[in-house]
């Protein structure tokens, strides 16, 4: 049995257990080929470049992107009552932000399609693409800064920080080809 087959077995047994418990409508779980993550990181970086470039001229891009994230499948409550995990489904975010991110949407969808070997999701998670990423639903600059320290990429996480009023590093501006962004 290889890793993908084992992952499928884990997903299917998890689904069966959730079905028995009556919670299968809420589930989402996927098997990811980690050798494909560089393409996902590149797609995420490119999405960050696109939105930062647009923010260079118009900071309302942040509000538009936030609306896309708010409408997207997200995980862990992300509200004051339940707390915040600040995790958004990458595929659904890209789908919602298509008008803003343009061709980055197709790049994200391709990277996800290549990397997600198997996935399950219940009726309440029908937009789950198989992979979630950080998005600051709570607007906490401290947690956003901590995320950026461990992020595998720099530009998307810099955009998230910028969108909640934090500074963008000169390195991220340089990498994205942006001279300066407007104040949020």
What do these predicted ranges mean?
Residues 1-184:
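Terminal, contiguous helix-loop blocks that mediate binding/assembly
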């Amino acid at each position: 049995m290889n890793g993908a087959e084992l992952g499928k077995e884990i997903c299917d047994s998890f689904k069966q257990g959730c079905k028995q418990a009556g919670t299968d409508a809420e589930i989402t779980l996927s098997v990811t080929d980690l050798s494909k993550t560089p393409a996902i990181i590149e797609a995420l970086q490119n999405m960050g470049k696109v939105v930062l470039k647009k923010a260079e001229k118009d900071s309302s891009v942040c509000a538009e992107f936030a609306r896309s994230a708010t409408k997207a499948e997200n995980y862990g409550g992300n509200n004051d009552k339940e707390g915040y995990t600040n995790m958004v489904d990458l595929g659904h975010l890209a789908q919602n932000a298509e008008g803003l991110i343009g061709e980055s949407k197709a790049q994200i969808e391709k990277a996800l399609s290549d990397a997600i070997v198997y996935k399950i999701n219940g009726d309440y998670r029908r937009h789950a693409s198989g992979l979630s990423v950080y998005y600051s639903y709570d607007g906490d600059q401290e947690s956003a800064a901590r995320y950026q320290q461990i992020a595998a990429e720099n530009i998307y996480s810099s955009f998230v920080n910028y969108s909640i009023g934090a500074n963008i590093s000169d390195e991220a501006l340089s990498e994205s080809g942006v001279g300066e962004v407007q104040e949020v």
